[in-house]
Amino acid sequence: MGFVLLPFLKKVIDLELENFVSLLDNIAKSAPLAEQSRRLPDQLVTELRMSGAFRALIPKKFSGLELPFEQYLDIIKRIAEQDASTAWCVNQAAVIATTSLWLPDQIISEIWEDPFASVANGPPYSCNISSDDGGYRLTGHWGFSSGCQHATWMTGPARFSEGGWRSAFFRPDQAQFDDTWHVAGLRATGSFEFRVKDLLVPATQIVNFDDDSTVKNDITTLPTALMFAISFAAVGLGVAKGALSDVIKIAQGKKPQWAALRLREDPDVQRFLGKATARWRSADTYLMHTAAEVIDSVRRNQEISHSQRSQLRMAGTHVIQECAEVVDLAYKISGSTGIYQDELLQRRFQDMHVITQHVQGRESYFGLLGRYAISGDYETGPMT
């Protein structure tokens, strides 16, 4: 049986819905407390749960919103414009949630009929899984688990003793969590490490991505890592747009010490701001056009080509890097105003420079894409 979602994100065809705007306002208001406590506040998590944000990409038959991915990206951008950590947690949960669509129908239903459900994960450090007593025996250590403090399910990949990889789903109370998240940016994601030892996991809670997914649609055709690539780039776009808004407000009233002009009157500031705005618009158009073009093809053909994979990989990485440049320009324009911790632009600066350090933002991918352009041979891997 399903349940009734509060209409924050439900059927968000018009993104100006009053309830969605109210949710965005609450995200912005909650951000300082979230930053201080290094986790999303409970009240905000409850609102996000009931909005359907954590199940935005799950099919309606399993009580999800089943949002088109292009529309989902727009929502992530708008959340990130208010607070990067909230957008990061929502996106991490919503995208990794789609891996549950390889589980049996009964388990998918069990997960998502719970109105409070959300999934957290992390990249593997040392993780092994083997067949045992009709199930699987799992020992592993994973990191960077954004949103794990409010998750109802954990999942993580592990190397299978018989070859390849498997992902296991298990409850948070079956894992040990290590608070290693003492960082400068994206503080409120609370991205702890987690581990299990000799955990017996039922076979029905194990995913083999070499098998066909239980649900077959455009979302399960898109590689999960590449969905993360373009959706984390969407987070970057929201952060960068917010930084531009911040510096415009600063420029309205600031007259730097010993300067002849206010920032808003300074031709250099105007030029830098114009360039930053153009770069943001170019990055936004590039990401959204690439995503729409590839997803439309995947929707029609139920397959993704190497060329399309390369397009998503390139768009995700490039846009993250461009957004950092935009934020840096805004930060430079702000002068000493931008250095204070209570200044919103400072938080965006820190958040953006954590995003660039993420595996999805690595500039080394450009080399892979260049080799593909020259040779026509695409190197598939966990991130490509």
Please report, for each region that a protein language model flagged, where it lies by residue.
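C-terminal helix-coil-helix/basic helical segment that borders enzyme active sites and/or dimer interfaces
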Residues: 28, 32-35, 282-318, 331-339
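Glycine-rich flavin
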Residues: 42-50, 54-151
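A short core secondary-structure module
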Residues: 144-177
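Glycine-rich beta->alpha junctions and the first turn(s) of the following alpha-helix
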Residues: 185-186, 191-281
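Generic structural signal for well-ordered, non-transmembrane alpha-helical segments
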Residues: 238, 274-281, 313, 317-324, ...
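Short segments within alpha-helical structural elements
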Residues: 325-332, 363-367
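Glycine-rich phosphate/cofactor-binding loops in nucleotide/flavin-utilizing enzymes
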Residues: 336-384
